[in-house]
């Protein structure tokens, strides 16, 4: 931006994909009846004690490794003290002094093709707060979310545009999704983004007052929020005024940021060590084992799909936009070697059905076994693309029959026996002798007419390539 350099730091809160909460055995499940998944620990009953969720620590280690972070094997927790209705204990268990991950990085590719490494300052484990629902001038609290395991991932203030912020969050989301660390559904709050934005004159190394924008729930809103806030701050600075340090929220309706509160003084959270959780020394062999079993990331799959399976970059990218689609593709290619055909069918007719019904592929009846069977039958010349159009609607909506059973029941097998095709053609030629008189002047029309009658008699169940070879021979025999 003219005259000013944009400084952006990103903080992401990511809900961990665990069955129970971070420090209690309460079940984790989105969308349940409010306040039905909170126990005595979540509600801070006197005398209750936290216990660390081992799975949550494993997921944090996976995330640290994928983000090229230094992993601290001494696990400690701290208390962040503040009073607010969504926090029954009066404090949050977090990792202020000793985060599990430090000094990481993530590479993004800009629209112009240039690469940029985004430095990540820290990753720490903490617990979520209760969900607040504002309605009819009242605030309702749902403690189902209270205590759910989170990792907070904080970048250094190294991003310089809305594009970089969006690409960073998109890439981070992809990594965490393919690691199965989180379902990262921004619309459900399992990936929440806060931005810290400030402007400074070009050439200056001093940071100006930053404005924090809270809880952005989509990539498009991140873009809009950054662009609006940059323009708002620029207008203030061009008037020789000072940008006030504030916390703001993004308004979907007006595509603008709105003041929540001013930060005149920094809040003192009086951090101190969590006395109810002793330091835990993680076994390095256990950490190494978790890392060695890390799932294949999308970037690794992308390279394999193109270099080993022969997919185009475009097809590989489309497959990898959905974890469900990727998993389905992986299962299917174990059952057939026509990898390109699998990809083409997934991203064309199958994706069209998913878009129409607003579903993911795991929500329909289609199985990898049935899709692979269709492709294998085509490759073996048992059915053609025409028969496929009959079979596909059935297997997309039902899994009670195998493809082979459907083909048999509907008599869809291609006739490939040359003797059988010859007999059929001879009968048609004998019934259309007058056509042969036109063969010398209009051969294509004669062949097309006879082939049309052949397809009509067999419901299209004749291999057209074999039939085309035979029809010319049979016509010439009868001239």
From Swiss-Prot:
Secretion signal span: none
Alphabetically ordered keywords of this record: ATP-binding, Ligase, Nucleotide-binding, Protein biosynthesis
GO biological process entries: glutaminyl-tRNAGln biosynthesis via transamidation; translation
Class of this enzyme: ligase
Superkingdom as given in the UniProt entry: Bacteria
Substrates-to-products reaction catalysed: L-glutamyl-tRNA(Gln) + L-glutamine + ATP + H2O = L-glutaminyl-tRNA(Gln) + L-glutamate + ADP + phosphate + H(+); L-aspartyl-tRNA(Asn) + L-glutamine + ATP + H2O = L-asparaginyl-tRNA(Asn) + L-glutamate + ADP + phosphate + 2 H(+)
Alphabetical list of InterPro entries matching this protein: Asn/Gln-tRNA_amidoTrfase_suB/E, Asn/Gln-tRNA_Trfase_suB/E_cat, Asn/Gln_amidotransferase, Asn/Gln_tRNA_amidoTrase-B-like, GatB, GatB_C_1, GatB_Yqey_C_2, Gln-tRNA_amidoTrfase_suB_CS
The EC number(s) this enzyme carries: 6.3.5.-
Any one GO molecular function term: ATP binding
HAMAP family: GatB
Record's function text: Allows the formation of correctly charged Asn-tRNA(Asn) or Gln-tRNA(Gln) through the transamidation of misacylated Asp-tRNA(Asn) or Glu-tRNA(Gln) in organisms which lack either or both of asparaginyl-tRNA or glutaminyl-tRNA synthetases. The reaction takes place in the presence of glutamine and ATP through an activated phospho-Asp-tRNA(Asn) or phospho-Glu-tRNA(Gln).
Known partners and oligomeric status: Heterotrimer of A, B and C subunits.
Family: Belongs to the GatB/GatE family. GatB subfamily.
Protein name, UniProt field: Aspartyl/glutamyl-tRNA(Asn/Gln) amidotransferase subunit B
Organism listed in the record: Mycoplasma mycoides subsp. mycoides SC (strain CCUG 32753 / NCTC 10114 / PG1)
């Amino acid at each position: 931006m003219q005259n000013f350099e944009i400084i952006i730091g990103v903080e992401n809160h990511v809900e961990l994909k665990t069955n129970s909460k971070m420090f209690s055995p309460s079940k984790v499940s989105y969308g349940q009846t409010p306040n039905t998944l909170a126990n005595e620990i979540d509600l801070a009953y006197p005398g209750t004690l936290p216990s660390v969720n081992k799975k949550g620590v494993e997921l944090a280690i996976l995330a640290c490794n994928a983000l090229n972070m230094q992993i601290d094997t001494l696990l400690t927790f701290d208390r962040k003290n503040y009073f607010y209705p969504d926090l029954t204990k009066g404090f949050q268990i977090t990792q202020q002094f000793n985060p599990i991950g430090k000094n990481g990085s993530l590479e993004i590719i800009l629209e112009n093709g240039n690469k940029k490494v985004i430095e990540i300052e820290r990753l720490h484990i903490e617990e979520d707060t209760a969900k607040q629902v504002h309605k009819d001038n009242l605030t309702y609290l749902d403690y189902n979310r209270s205590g759910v395991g989170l990792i907070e991932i904080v970048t250094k203030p190294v991003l310089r545009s809305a594009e970089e912020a969006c690409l960073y969050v998109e890439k981070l989301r992809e990594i965490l999704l393919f690691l199965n660390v989180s379902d990262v559904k921004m619309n459900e709050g399992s990936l929440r983004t806060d931005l810290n934005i400030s402007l400074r004159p070009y050439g200056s190394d001093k940071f100006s007052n930053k404005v924090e924008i809270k809880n952005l729930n989509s990539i498009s809103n991140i873009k809009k929020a950054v662009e609006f806030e940059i323009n708002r701050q620029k207008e203030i600075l061009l008037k020789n005024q000072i940008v006030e340090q504030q916390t703001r929220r993004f308004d979907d309706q007006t595509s603008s940021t709105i003041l929540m509160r001013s930060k005149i003084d920094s809040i003192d959270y009086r951090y101190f060590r969590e006395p109810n959780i002793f330091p835990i020394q993680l076994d390095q062999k256990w950490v190494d084992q978790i890392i060695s079993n890390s799932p294949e990331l999308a970037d690794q799959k992308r390279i394999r799909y193109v270099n080993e399976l022969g997919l185009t970059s475009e097809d590989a990218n489309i497959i990898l936009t959905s974890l469900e689609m990727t998993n389905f593709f992986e299962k299917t290619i174990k059952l057939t070697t026509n990898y390109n055909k699998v990809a083409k069918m997934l991203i064309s007719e199958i994706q069209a059905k998913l878009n129409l019904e607003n579903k993911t592929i795991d929500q329909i009846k289609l199985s990898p076994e049935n899709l692979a069977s269709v492709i294998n039958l085509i490759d073996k010349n048992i059915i053609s693309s025409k028969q496929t159009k009959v079979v596909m609607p059935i297997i997309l909506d039902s899994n009670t029959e195998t493809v082979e059973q459907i083909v048999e029941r509907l008599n869809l097998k291609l006739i490939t026996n040359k003797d059988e095709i010859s007999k059929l053609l001879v009968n048609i030629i004998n019934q259309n002798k007058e056509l042969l008189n036109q063969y010398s002047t209009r051969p294509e029309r004669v062949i097309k007419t006879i082939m049309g009658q052949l397809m009509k008699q067999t419901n299209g169940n004749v291999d057209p390539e074999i039939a085309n070879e035979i029809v010319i021979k049979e016509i010439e025999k009868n001239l």
